[in-house]
Amino acid sequence: LETGGTGPKVRPVVACKGTTCQYGLIDTVAFSRTIHERFYKGWHDVRLPHKFKIAVGGCPNNCVKPDLNDLGVIGQRVPSHDLSKCRGCKVCQIEKACPIGASRLGESRLDWNEEMCNHCGRCVGKCPFGVVGEEKRGYAVYIGGRWGKRTAQGRMLAHVFTSEEEVLEVIERALTLFRDEGSAGE
């Protein structure tokens, strides 16, 4: 990757170490290189209303803060739950594995708060009775983040994308919309 980039253009892509980390769910290095080639280099001569920053994080731990960039990508491992298999163990491995408390043992079985779940996937396969499996792996895309004097967390699109091509298309559309409709300094 090349360093540098100034002015109202796509900036160099930032990424965490991805799959070389124990929590990495996607190959951030390879994917950020693809994004870099297509948008940093490919859009190098395209003037935008303001700089445009892109970050790729391998998991929901948010180490490189993708949600605080104009566009951020975060690896996802969406769990599937079959709560009918839950036996209400008093030593629930799913509850122990969940770093944010989205899964808790209730009076008789596991309670899963889907709204709270960040799709880190640490609970997948932890239950010996097969309560939690993997529904899909993919990418969450955040748009509209900002870092600096005025910080704003980007909004996650309401869909977990399952291929890099889908994400690249979202980036292309976001950049095209920003180029055509964005305001200077926005």
Where are these regions (language model features)?
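Small-residue-enriched alpha-helical segments and adjacent helix-cap loops
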Residues: 1-91, 111, 116-118
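A glycine-rich, aromatic-flanked flexible loop/lid motif
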Residues: 5-10, 94, 137-149
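Predominant activation on well-ordered alpha-helical scaffold segments within soluble catalytic domains
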Residues: 29, 33-36, 95, 168-175
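A domain-level signal for the structural core that forms small-molecule/cofactor-binding pockets
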Residues: 61, 72-77, 136, 141-147
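Short, well-structured alpha-helical interface segments that form or flank functional binding sites
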Residues: 68, 122, 169
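Iron-sulfur cluster-binding cysteine motifs and their immediate structural context
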Residues: 91-112, 122-138
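A hydrophobic, small-residue-rich beta->alpha segment in the mid-to-C-terminal subdomain
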Residues: 137, 145-185
